[in-house]
Amino acid sequence: MKARNAVLVDGVRSPFARGGRGKLEATRLDEVGALLIKELLRRNPQVEPTMIEDCGIGHGGSQYDVAGLGNITRLAGLPVEVTNFMTDRQCGSSMETAQRVAMGIMLGSYDCGLSVGVERMGRTMGAGMGGGPK
């Protein structure tokens, strides 16, 4: 079996701010991830949401609000058929998910996938619990 080429089409970056009481402190991680997906789809109208078959979600750390990150695809409006997986590789989570999605494409498991990374270093497990995932 010959491996197919995987192509990175586009990338977006979430905003960042000061830790602690910065402007994004109250912003939920699942909402940040959903905004990234929505922006990618807006910038690439040739990619229909139904074309996406898998979404890798990387997070660095053990924040309480990563428990429902699988909902990112639903909050972004992707079809329920889009599968997703989560990876915690500390500082390498987003790269790990990008590699796994690329491998899936190269091996023919699917044709189109997304990789998303979200983290909040200012609010780790046990630091001001509350406001979990949607």
What are these regions (language model features)?
Residues 39-51:
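Phosphate/pyrophosphate-binding loops at sites that engage ATP/ADP/AMP, CoA/4′-phosphopantetheine
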Residues 19-21, 66-67, 123-130:
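Short acidic, glycine/serine/threonine-rich loops at helix termini
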Residues 50-58:
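Short glycine-rich phosphate-binding loop at a beta-alpha junction
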Residues 1-2, 29, 36, 44-45, ...:
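Terminal domain-initiation and capping elements
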Residues 16-38, 61-62, 85-99, 122:
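Active-site pocket-shaping loop/turn-to-helix segments
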Residues 59-112:
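Conserved catalytic cysteine-centered active-site region
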Residues 111-134:
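Flexible glycine-/small-residue-enriched beta->alpha junction loops
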Residues 1-17:
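N-terminal amphipathic/basic leader segments beginning at the initiator methionine
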